[in-house]
Amino acid sequence: MAGKTLYDKLWDAHLVAEREDGSALIYIDRQIIHEVTSPQAFEGLRLAGRQPWRTSASVATIDHNVPTTPFNSAADITDETSRIQVQTLENNTREFGITEFGIGDVRQGIVHVMAPEQGAVVPGMTVVCGDSHTSTNGALACLAHGIGTSEVEHVLATQTLVAKKMNNMRVSVEGELGPGVTAKDVVLHIIGVIGTAGGTGYALEFAGSAMRSLSMEGRMTVCNMAIEAGARAGMVAVDDVTIDYVKGRPFAPKGADWDKAEAYWRTLVSDADAQFDQQVDIDAADIKPQVSWGTSPEMVVPVDAHLPDPAAETDEVKRSGMTRAYEYMGLTPGMPVTEIKVDRVFIGSCTNSRIEDLRAAAEVAKGRQKAGSVKQVLVVPGSGLVKQQAEKEGLDKIFVEAGFEWREPGCSMCLAMNPDRLEAGEHCASTSNRNFEGRQGNGGRTHLVSPAMAAAAAVAGHFVDIRELDQA
């Protein structure tokens, strides 16, 4: 009998029932809830006279709509829709007995930063949230993916989900990452290689020596963008890095329960003889600091490259997409990446707002000044605890002295659902995960980069090769 992949093990451990049509019912260990995709789910429970099946399996926080400037209550939120959604989550969690880290709680933050940070996500879990970037949590060897609002209600009511088993893909990144190359560059490079549809229908396991060399924060960055590679879920096998990260966190097992859990978690690796439906091999030496230039995450090139020429693209659909992207972005084929000027910089999001990310940005910002041509640089920690740790290390002072703005936790400029957004025509060096048209504001132009690359663009006023920053 062939060995099992990590995904196979997670699926089999949670399988409740299967149907002949290929659909299945799987048990869900953890649901993470935020203010945008949950109101209708709670209302559905209320109308049906149901209670959550297991209140302790859910944990909630506010992130998408909250301002990143200081506020003391929901009443301080000026946008009516945002204010109502924040208040509604507070009311719903209170009514149904679900833990929420809300306004004024230091644990409040972006869902996919808060949950692992609290140990609310541990290896071996099935994890869902009404948010596509739930895949972030797969870094902890979980089956984690986004669900729709009706499914949020279904999980609340039954602690199960109707799902269809995905195929297995392994992306192996072998070798040593070069100077200035981060987890963000790794995943942008992967997407550049396989495309935004490359992972469609697959659960992606990220493997190889370069992946194992990443911290847990780095692995979360990679799994976060499995979605942009077309997959629904991304994951990394358990190793010592995983175990060390989880140990001692508030929700994590303790004492004898920890010993039993760790013994099980150590089995959460793909067997040596496991069969994958698709295998992608990448040499770490080929990965350079990346910059996205277009309106899809696959439109990405190394920082020392020139922008590609649509005329060289043989696929007519891709060629048309590239031409449209150039028109939207206001760029010219063949221009060096380092000639792209930026108007604003955003360092944050569920992709890159953890303490490691802020340290990398601060290292670049230290002793330097925001370029006069750059209108704004936002640094937004992923949670109150990340903010607290950064301030303990003095990172906030480094950012402020460089002319950057140090903000409160939230999703911020990743998406135009709160006061932080781009104006039409503005170019933004962003550590977020999506560069679609209008994602950061109507007519805004997004360039996806690592925190260090974003900070370097902030001080130079244009993209620079982080490996040559002192010469820029």
UniProtKB/Swiss-Prot annotation:
It comes from the Bacteria. Binds 1 [4Fe-4S] cluster per subunit. Keywords: 4Fe-4S, Amino-acid biosynthesis, Branched-chain amino acid biosynthesis, Iron, Iron-sulfur, Leucine biosynthesis, Lyase, Metal-binding. It is an enzyme of class 4 (lyase). One of its GO terms (biological process) is L-leucine biosynthetic process. CDD domains: IPMI. Its cofactor is [4Fe-4S] cluster. Pathway: Amino-acid biosynthesis; L-leucine biosynthesis; L-leucine from 3-methyl-2-oxobutanoate: step 2/4. It catalyses: (2R,3S)-3-isopropylmalate = (2S)-2-isopropylmalate. [4Fe-4S] cluster binds at C350, C411, C414. GO terms for molecular function: 3-isopropylmalate dehydratase activity; 4 iron, 4 sulfur cluster binding; metal ion binding. Its EC number is 4.2.1.33. InterPro entries: 3-IsopropMal_deHydase_lsu, Acnase/IPM_dHydase_lsu_aba_1/3, Acoase/IPM_deHydtase_lsu_aba, Aconitase_4Fe-4S_BS, Aconitase_4Fe-4S_dom, IPM_dehydratase_rel_enz, IPMI_cat. PROSITE patterns: ACONITASE_1, ACONITASE_2. Belongs to the aconitase/IPM isomerase family. LeuC type 1 subfamily. Catalyzes the isomerization between 2-isopropylmalate and 3-isopropylmalate, via the formation of 2-isopropylmaleate. Heterodimer of LeuC and LeuD. This is 3-isopropylmalate dehydratase large subunit.
